[in-house]
Amino acid sequence: SEIFLTGTLRYLNTNLKAQIHQIIDDTIKSVEGITDAQITWSIPHTSPGLVNDATCTKLIIDAAQSLLGPENVQIMKESSMGGEDFAYYLEEIPGAYFRIGCSDGKTRDIHTNDFNLDERCMATAIKVFAETVRRYFRIHHD
């Protein structure tokens, strides 16, 4: 008989990718060694971990705090395991990924059919982006 397992493998630190793959490979060989199982595994594609540039992150935090007040800017204490295409950009150029809260007071999960973005948050996002760009050019344009 055959069993197929599928899943997602994500890394907070892309530098650990080879080490994690080796641990998986060693574990599979151990299982094969104590059973009659023949195991084939592959990871055809993995997305990079999203790692913000510290300088860009500070620029965004400073801009957001000046516009919204420090009490309205939350810094995530732990990394997120969510996959994000923005990580590919950060492999090429410095940048920072950040979230703009858009709660309307009703709890609905994103990526569901009843999620409804409160578009009023777009104005806040645009202001933070614009202030970040203004600060960037004030520092780097002189």
Regions found by a protein language model. Give the residues of each.
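Metal-dependent amide/peptide-bond hydrolase catalytic core
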Residues: 1-142
